Amino acid sequence: MTDITFHGGVNDIGGNKFLVESKYTKVFMDFGMSFSQDGQFFSQFLGPRTSNSLNDLFELGILPKIKGLYRRDYAKHMDFDGYEDTEVDAVLLTHAHVDHCAYIPYLREDIPIYCSEESKLIMQNFDETGSDQYHTAKQRFQIYENNKGQISRASGDKVAVPRRIKIFESGKEFNLSLIHISE
């Protein structure tokens, strides 16, 4: 038996986040931003607080509070008991518009993201032109002692962890764990 849980995108424009579960497999279809929810709480220059973003998004009902789904550095920093093993096998991205993929940067980097080559290139462009992290997850809360003996926050490529992005060919059938994907 297969279950589908809608965590967004119902009676709304965007925010698509559907969890498809079978006996042995859990796959998210998209992980996007709801335009109405985002506009209700945020603006162009006001977003979730950087050091408390997951809690903000949980409290506002924008992201589902699912243990093991989110990046370990965020979960640990925000005292969210979510840094254990994940039960989600993958994210299947239908296409790389923000209403389908905007919250991928919050996901654990070891959860594979299945997408078309075109979507991968669009997400790569998001990385290169903004501060989002679709292809790599840069650890946000890692500190170290610098060569002056001062405490610094690690940044840039030093703390980048590549995501597992798997390419599928548009229009072709494929298997994602025990789920068969077809047109």
Where do the language-model regions lie?
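Short internal beta-strands
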Residues: 112-120
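Pre-active-site segment of Zn-dependent metallo-hydrolases
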Residues: 25-92, 119, 124-140, 144-145
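Divalent metal-coordination and catalytic microenvironments
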Residues: 4, 30, 95-96
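Di-metal (Zn2+ and/or Mg2+/Mn2+) metal-binding site signature of metallo-dependent hydrolases
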Residues: 84-110
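Short Gly/Pro-enriched turn/cap motifs at secondary-structure boundaries
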Residues: 8-10
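Conserved small/polar residues in nucleotide/adenosyl-binding loops
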Residues: 179-183
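Short beta-strand scaffold segments in enzyme catalytic cores
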Residues: 15-20
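Active-site neighborhood of divalent metal-dependent phosphoester bond hydrolases
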Residues: 129-167
